Amino acid sequence: MFHVKQFDVIVIGGGHAGCEAAAAAARMGVRAALVTLRPSDLGVMSCNPAIGGLGKGHLVREIDALDGLMGRAADAAGIQFRLLNRKKGPAVQGPRAQADRRLYRAAMQRFLLEQPGLDVVEGEVVDLLLDQGTATGVLLADGTRLDAKAVVLTSGTFLNGTIHIGHDRRPGGRMGDLPSIPLAQRLMDLNLSRGRLKTGTPPRLDGRTIDWTQLEMQPGDADPVMFSFLNHAPVARQISCGITSTNERTHEIVRDNLHQSAMYGGHIEGVGPRYCPSIEDKIVRFADKTGHQVFLEPEGLDDHTVYPNGISTSLPAEVQESYVRTIAGLEEVKILQPGYAIEYDYFDPRELRPTLEVKAMCGLYFAGQINGTTGYEEAAAQGLAAGLNAALAVRGREPLHFSRSDSYIGVMIDDLTSRGVTEPYRMFTSRAEFRLSLRADNADQRLTQTGIDLGCVGPARRDAFLTKMDSLSRGRTMLQQVMLTPTDLARLEIRISQDGTRRSAFDVMAFGEEAASAVERAVPELALLPHDIRQQLARDALYAQFIARQELEAQSLKRDEAVRIPSDFDYGSLSGLSHELTAKLLHARPATIAQAARLEGMTPSALMLILSRLRRASRSAAAG
């Protein structure tokens, strides 16, 4: 029977991108549908049981600042929390949590179920409904038609997905799930630039057959840092992970069987992630290394499965068993599921607007691995951006443009839509020019007010944020009103040149932890503020002078981002523009001068040609 249901926004896929997209759209007050093959699989962690890390933790904090789900789910499921780069400055520290898969999935499903305006629809999308260059809905395999004003596609690794284990290849979106073939074929009809990428996963081990006594054990932090600004402590029991390493015998077995690897046997055309190489890649690329670390990560408190982080592979199952059992502590281990590589379709993200809407198809948005990224966090951040923008478009409001100067989300989206990808893209702090101001600890200060203005932040977060900002403002005023001479600082045992310069207590906090502690003694009123507020004031003070310089650079970037380039701009008519640059500009169709400036091979003179034409057009429009 043919059924028709009406929604404002339809999200296809219930992975990390899809969950965030659907929830974000619903928080904006539109009616959203999340279409998934199995509702019980919403929020499944398909690969490693962990959230966050360097750069990735920043993305999770930014998602949380806009009232997204991932940070709260990770806090609910976290069984080991570690702040990476703890000995370095806050700008490059990254929160990370080992998660219980079952608890994470349960938390995500609970958040989605509790979200007003969101319906979960079970089914397989086999067709996109299009009308004169606009997405108008989807068709399900059972004949049900879902109409909508915007569609967000978050297909993960399911588009033409193929699983490889040695010479064996089979269709699959992930182990145990069929791929999406009809939808992949439909997308090919849109004439978008398509490619193939691959990712891999290690064998899963039975923790009861591991000799944990041979391993170095790694506990979590004694003072765990949460992902969500609303949470302050773990709720699940905390555990340790084990550390072991490969050895020469391991490497010998892998080398002797490279011809049986799907990757090295020529069965895979897709490019894999550079920063998450398979054990085959590690042994070929780093032939001089005698060992590679392997982190044994329990997948849950009530689950015996262990994820051996560091040995993803596409070798045959029997070879996997041989090399795994050469590793200390794993001599008698039982493999519960072999590792495998998965190859899938992605589409060139340069064919997207900065809102993640497909340039050639109004109302159609892409988010996650379909855009060439890898990682839960990257997918979730894109889902958030796409869901918010789809809802804004439905309501006839201006889109949300994340900037390189305000968020890691902005850095990622700009990288994708301006430069495209040649390999799976993952986030690092090194990708951000303004990383001193784009810290994980201040994501709420950067983004939550934007979320309040948009309408995607709920009352609980809004009230907590406004209370925090009021406390920070009072604390900063308090510190800036206390002026200290070099003599005062000497009494506080803060060494500084006796130059006669009076400094505010806030400026003195920038001298480091000891200075911050001394300032707290000198300004006893600070003790009235909560501990986390005092910590945040110290971090803000530490970077204040550097941020002032970066703000000048950010203002310059924002000026360039404000200069919009029409989508039909005629680059071919610019005399003096090289054929190579003309071709790149026509392909990329940058939305702003800032995006054009970041294209490979772009020159200052070429930018001036474009700016000159834009200014001339602006003057003509004003005169006419």
Swiss-Prot record:
Required cofactor names: FAD
Record's keyword annotation contains Heme: no
Gene Ontology BP annotations: tRNA methylation; tRNA wobble uridine modification
Residues reported in the UniProt entry to bind FAD: 13-18, 125, 180, 369
Domain of life: Bacteria
GO cellular component: cytosol
Disulfide bonds: none
Annotated NAD(+) binding sites: 272-286
UniProt keyword terms in alphabetical order: Cytoplasm, FAD, Flavoprotein, NAD, tRNA processing
Location(s) in or outside the cell: Cytoplasm
Record bears the keyword Transferase: no
Molecular function via GO: flavin adenine dinucleotide binding
PROSITE patterns xrefs: GIDA_1, GIDA_2
InterPro entries: FAD/NAD-bd_sf (IPR036188), GIDA_C_N (IPR049312), MnmG (IPR004416), MnmG-rel (IPR002218), MnmG-rel_CS (IPR020595), MnmG_C (IPR026904), MnmG_C_subdom (IPR047001), MnmG_C_subdom_sf (IPR044920)
Self-association and partners: Homodimer. Heterotetramer of two MnmE and two MnmG subunits.
Similarity annotation: Belongs to the MnmG family.
HAMAP family noted in UniProt: MnmG_GidA
Function: NAD-binding protein involved in the addition of a carboxymethylaminomethyl (cmnm) group at the wobble position (U34) of certain tRNAs, forming tRNA-cmnm(5)s(2)U34.
Name of the protein this chain belongs to: tRNA uridine 5-carboxymethylaminomethyl modification enzyme MnmG
Species this chain originates from: Cereibacter sphaeroides (strain ATCC 17025 / ATH 2.4.3)
